[in-house]
Amino acid sequence: MNSPLEAARAAAIHAARAARARYRAGVVEPTAGRAPGMTQANMIALPREWAWDFLLYAQRNPKPCPVLDVIEAGSHATVLAEGADLRTDIPLYRVWRDGRLAGEVSDATALWAGQPDLVTFLIGCSFTFETPLQEAGIEVRHIAQGCNVPMYRTQRMRRPAGRLRGELVVSMRPVPADRVADAVSISGRFPSVHGAPVHVGDPAALGIADLARPDFGDPVEIHPGEVPVFWACGVTPQAAVMASGVPFAVTHAPGHMFITDVPDSTYHV
């Protein structure tokens, strides 16, 4: 007979696999709040000739680009989710050509077929520590509002690597002022999925002019007594694709992550 912990873990894995099956069938939705307790990941796939530059870029910028898995050229499987297909199991993909957004698709199979040497990187995502935040009584506003997390380009440039350069992208969650320390402590125990915030308070210090106009995702309400808290974001690689004019890349659409079979506790330290 399974223990309650084993039963809960099995239910969480089932939820992750069910979510991937929905996305494979064409359902498009932000993944925040889906399969609670399971690790989520950002995705970027680039031609093999750009893979070393990106691996070095991620190594030099681990806060926004914590690598969870690297998938060899041409493969679309990952050890983070047995039987998953990275071409179909993310709800929405972005296609980039010469650093510009060329379109969005819900099935990227044809893109892999047309570019058989794609090397894929899975990058840690802050959605992973949202369940612990909620369990501590800290509301995650975009989940409560049923929308995507707001994300912003900043004026903080990242350390370049090879042909890649670009600015930091951050996600924002409003937190009651008296719970900010708790949010910092909780998220800080998850360094492989961005860890503690990079900034608390005045968005102008990051070069963000208007919180009501995010560059990616949706705006959320900020209630009296709350302060904006900013975390490094796995959309940072997409900013590098844009700034560097990468000839071809496939990424997840912001807020539409790959849900793994790995419990978030795996990345808790």
From Swiss-Prot:
Entry EC number(s): 4.2.1.-
Keywords attached to this entry: Lyase
InterPro entries according to UniProt: D-Glu_cyclase, Putative_hydro-lyase, UPF0317
Signal peptide coordinates: none
Enzyme class: lyase
UniProt cross-references to SUPFAM superfamilies, sorted A to Z: PSTPO5379-like
A single MF term (Gene Ontology): lyase activity
Top-rank lineage group of the source organism: Bacteria
Protein family membership: Belongs to the D-glutamate cyclase family.
Alphabetized HAMAP family for the sequence: Hydro_lyase (MF_01830)
Name of the molecule in the record: Putative hydro-lyase Aave_3512
Organism: Paracidovorax citrulli (strain AAC00-1)
